[in-house]
From Swiss-Prot:
Domain of life: Bacteria
The protein, known as: DNA-directed RNA polymerase subunit epsilon
GO CC annotations on file: DNA-directed RNA polymerase complex
Family label: Belongs to the RNA polymerase subunit epsilon family.
InterPro entries, sorted: RpoY
Function of the protein: A non-essential component of RNA polymerase (RNAP).
Enzyme kind, highest EC tier: transferase
Gene behind the chain: rpoY
Enzyme Commission no: 2.7.7.6
Gene Ontology BP, a term: DNA-templated transcription
């Protein structure tokens, strides 16, 4: 399953909407995704599954790239 993760690049950084970034990652569950990203110094704001029409919409975006961690 593919998940979209909204995060700040620095865990010590205060969450500011304008600095929020996102990435796509494959995982079994939200917990699995968080474990995969635990070694990164990210402040993870939100993790959501991307399926169905939402996945098709995101894949149509030129920025869509699934990260392998």
């Amino acid at each position: 399953m593919i998940f979209k993760v909204y995060y700040q690049e620095d865990a010590a950084q205060m969450p500011v909407r304008e600095r929020t970034k996102s990435l796509y990652i494959e995982g079994e569950s939200e917990a699995d995704v968080r474990l995969k990203l635990a070694k990164q110094n990210f402040n993870i704001e939100y993790v959501t599954a991307v399926t169905g029409a939402y996945l098709e919409y995101e894949q149509a975006n030129s920025d869509f790239k699934v990260v392998n961690i």
